[in-house]
Regions:
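Membrane-proximal helix-turn-helix segments that form the acceptor-binding/catalytic region
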Residues: 72-79, 102-106, 113, 133-153
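Nucleotide-activated donor-binding/catalytic signature segment of Leloir-type glycosyltransferases, i.e.
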Residues: 242-269
Length: 381
């Protein structure tokens, strides 16, 4: 590769254009002087649509018509992309890989797939196998092929990488690790101007899904309902939102508020006013292998974080120094962790300070972008 020619990347597929992993990867590369041309066609309408398709909706003629039109648009746009050095398929992109492999092969260019998460595991964890076991097994076959065709796979944790190696026979030399990170242009330390200092505010935000175990937070709020100084806010939507709200209503909790999704600026301000960020507490395979965006965002904001313990958490962060870990699927353990942090201001300050230091040393927007650029340059040489 000429030292005078900037790397040119084609970011390709029916990926979720607004999903943080895709959006941040594109912006990180551009910040590191990589030219990124997006070749995207929308296929998915949202979370419920993806679940409906995975549960057997892919058999309906309407979906096939939608898919055919999406891939025709994608091919048309690809024909106008021009020269590129590496083709990257964004998340989720399992169905896109065979086409991407053909197109990149015709141009003799390397293919990279940012795997992010297993849609097969997602389908299993959301119970889709009960309604359509054939569809879920088909998803597994498609995903296995999608992981074997590219020249390089990008995965966020070593635990998830081992899962792909064990389940799909992927060679370790074909995998590179790239943490999720956060958009620290927005998620950064900031003051709260509307905080009631008499209230200890515990904030959860994210998708209400099984592997996050939002019900554990509700149960912890129930255990702490007699303490007027502790309040909970849960922000977001998702398949488990109604079930979680019903559980909270059954307890008549006055210390817990559900809030719909908001724009990111308002979300950041809400987080700035929280005394502690609550992570995930489920025990599904994905919950144990991943580190969610909200964890990195909390570190970037210098906020104390409570999360369920797991191999990936213990191998990356240090309990009592950069994060506070408790037993998963255990409301009493979460309630005790909240009380510990509420009563120990020095511990909260240490978690905030050391967590932020860890983020600055390992996970900044620019550092992750440099690492991704390095992977692509090594592949292009």
């Amino acid at each position: 590769m000429s030292v005078n020619k900037a790397l040119r990347v084609c970011y390709f597929g029916t990926y979720r254009a607004t999903y943080p992993r895709n959006r941040l990867n594109i912006e990180r590369l551009r910040m590191n002087e990589v030219e990124v041309v997006e070749c995207h066609a929308g296929l998915w309408k949202g979370l419920e649509d993806r679940e409906q398709v995975a549960g057997g909706g892919w058999l309906k003629p309407g979906f096939w018509l939608r898919a055919i039109l999406a891939y025709l648009r994608l091919i048309w746009r690809y024909l106008h992309v021009g020269r590129y050095d590496v083709l990257i398929v964004g998340y989720p992109g399992q169905p896109d890989i065979p086409l991407a492999r053909l197109l990149s092969w015709l141009r003799r260019k390397p293919l990279v797939y940012d795997v992010m998460m297993s849609i097969y595991l997602i389908a299993q964890e959301r119970g889709l196998e009960q309604s359509s076991s054939f569809s879920v097994q088909l998803i597994r076959s498609v995903e296995r092929l999608a992981c074997r065709l590219p020249d390089l796979l990008i995965i966020d944790t070593s635990e998830y990488a081992r899962w792909y190696q064990d389940n799909y026979g992927i060679r370790s030399e074909k995998i590179r690790l790239l943490p999720l990170g956060a958009d620290d242009r927005l998620f950064k330390p900031r003051d709260c101007h509307e905080k009631d200092d008499s209230i200890f505010l515990c904030l959860y935000y994210g998708t209400f899904i099984r592997n996050h175990a939002p019900g554990v937070i509700v149960e912890a709020a129930h255990l702490l309902a007699g303490d007027p100084t502790i309040r909970f806010e849960m922000i977001g939507q998702g398949p488990e939102r109604e079930k979680t709200a019903t559980l909270a209503n059954s307890y008549g909790l006055a210390n817990l508020t559900f809030i719909d999704w908001m724009d990111v600026d308002e979300l950041v301000q809400r987080a700035a006013c929280a005394d502690v960020i609550l992570g995930t507490f489920g025990i599904t395979p994905q919950a144990l292998m991943t580190m969610q965006h909200k964890i990195h965002e909390g570190l970037a904001m210098a906020k104390p974080i409570i999360n369920g313990e797991s191999p990936v958490m213990s191998s990356t962060l240090q309990h009592g120094e950069t994060i506070y870990l408790c037993e998963r699927q255990n409301p009493r353990a979460l309630a005790n962790a909240i009380l510990t942090l509420r009563d120990d201001q020095q511990l909260r300050a240490r978690l905030a300070r050391q967590g932020y230091k860890f983020y600055q040393e390992n996970l900044t927007f620019n550092k992750i972008g440099m690492k991704l650029k390095q992977y692509l340059e090594e592949l292009h040489r």
